[in-house]
């Protein structure tokens, strides 16, 4: 069991390092090519997109990870196949509802919450992700529950590579004076990356379950309804938690630019400042999540299996070590960002005035890192 947790954490950590490096280099290139205004427009759109994705996903990755880890040893692949079919049908129905909301409700919401019309225009290119991401998340949850961390890790790397290459290519292709086109190009690149990662995971999923799928009979309606209860009982609390944070992000994305405009900044200046905050400062601040995110994800199936077998002493050891590693890794990076935030902004992104923002943000950063580890423990339980 310890080897599985260690192996899963190492795979996810290596993947997270690669993803973080690719994402960080991408952010640097985006800021240098397009500036922070286009990044600000996209990041004002993303919370509303994520709100719909969270609802469409309905916590299925965590639910599937936990149920797969619990049932695969005792019930076999047949039961897991029934659960996966139900999960796919559930996210399909939820994605359809969220697509309708994106087309009918969101335009009115943007007109009420944002004075910058470019935000609603940029949102259009993100709509395909409302269907792609939930299906991708279901397959990722299956592999994590089987403690096969390699496939979802490679899938995320494929997604990021496509996003980086397409994003840079589109930015160089559009006019540098057209800020909206650059923002939409970044959104389109993200959707192409999501699609590529989803195709990879689908191929790996069908390959890993080809024998079970061929031998599995058609599932009855009663069987699908029977699986709804455990999936939703685990998924709804996770969704409620994520909705809280996503709604908070959406409110922030609306209030911060509005307050900047009230303070005397123009629409363009407000978008640029918000891009500096969300795209530059937060990129630096999330560096420790390379470890804490990987650790939190790997803890879910490991904690779930230990808790199901009643091994309380081993459970306490896992929790204590995870929190200790989080503290040891996060604190030095927080101090570096507090002291040298301005220097990092000038050296990497060629922007000034980042130091004061980084000093304020670093005070609350430790709770973000610790929260990822603790959430992984609680979701495993």
Regions found by a protein language model. Give the residues of each.
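N-terminal membrane topogenesis motif
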Residues: 1-22, 78, 82, 219-245, ...
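Short runs within selected transmembrane alpha-helices of multi-pass transporters and secretion channels
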Residues: 19, 27, 58-65, 125-144, ...
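Interfacial/gating helices of multi-pass transporter permease domains
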Residues: 30-51, 179, 183-184, 227-234, ...
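Helix-loop junctions and terminal segments of transmembrane helices
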Residues: 58-73, 285-310, 319, 323
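Membrane-water interface segments that mark the loop-to-transmembrane alpha-helix transition
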Residues: 62-107, 134, 316-330
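Short membrane-interface helical motifs at transmembrane helix boundaries
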Residues: 97-115, 120, 332-350
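Alpha-helical transmembrane segments of multi-pass membrane transporters
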Residues: 154-179, 337
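C-terminal transmembrane helix end/exit motif
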Residues: 169-174, 192-220
């Amino acid at each position: 069991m310890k080897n599985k947790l260690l192996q899963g954490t190492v795979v996810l950590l290596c993947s997270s390092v690669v993803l973080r490096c690719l994402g960080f280099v991408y952010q640097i290139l985006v800021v240098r090519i397009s500036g922070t205004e286009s990044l600000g427009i996209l990041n004002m759109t993303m919370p509303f997109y994520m709100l719909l994705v969270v609802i469409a996903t309905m916590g299925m990755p965590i639910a599937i990870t936990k149920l797969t880890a619990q049932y695969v040893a005792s019930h076999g692949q047949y039961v897991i196949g029934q659960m996966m079919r139900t999960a796919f049908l559930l996210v399909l129905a939820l994605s359809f509802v969220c697509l309708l909301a994106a087309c009918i409700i969101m335009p009115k919401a943007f007109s009420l919450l944002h004075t910058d019309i470019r935000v609603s225009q940029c949102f259009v290119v993100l709509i395909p992700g409302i269907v792609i991401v939930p299906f991708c998340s279901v397959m990722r949850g299956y592999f994590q529950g089987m403690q096969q961390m390699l496939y979802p890790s490679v899938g995320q790397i494929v997604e990021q590579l496509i996003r980086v290459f397409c994003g840079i290519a589109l930015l160089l292709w559009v006019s540098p004076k057209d800020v909206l086109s650059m923002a939409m190009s970044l959104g389109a690149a993200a959707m192409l990356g999501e699609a590529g990662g989803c195709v990879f995971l689908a191929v790996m999923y069908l390959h890993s379950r080809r024998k079970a799928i061929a031998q599995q009979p058609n599932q009855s309606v009663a069987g699908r309804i029977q699986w709804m209860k455990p999936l939703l009982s685990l998924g709804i609390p996770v969704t409620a938690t994520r909705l809280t944070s996503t709604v908070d992000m959406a409110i922030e994305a609306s209030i911060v630019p509005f307050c900047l405009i009230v303070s005397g900044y123009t629409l363009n200046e407000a978008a640029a400042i918000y891009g500096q905050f969300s795209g530059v400062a937060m990129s630096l601040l999330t560096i420790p999540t390379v470890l804490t995110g990987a650790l939190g994800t790997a803890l879910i199936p490991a904690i779930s299996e230990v808790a199901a077998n009643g091994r309380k002493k081993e459970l306490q050891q896992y929790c204590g070590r995870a929190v200790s590693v989080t503290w040891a890794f996060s604190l030095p990076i927080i101090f570096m960002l507090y002291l040298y935030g301005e220097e990092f902004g000038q050296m990497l992104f060629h922007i000034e005035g980042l130091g004061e923002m980084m000093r304020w943000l670093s005070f609350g950063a430790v709770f973000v890192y610790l929260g990822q580890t603790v959430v992984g423990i609680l979701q495993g339980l």
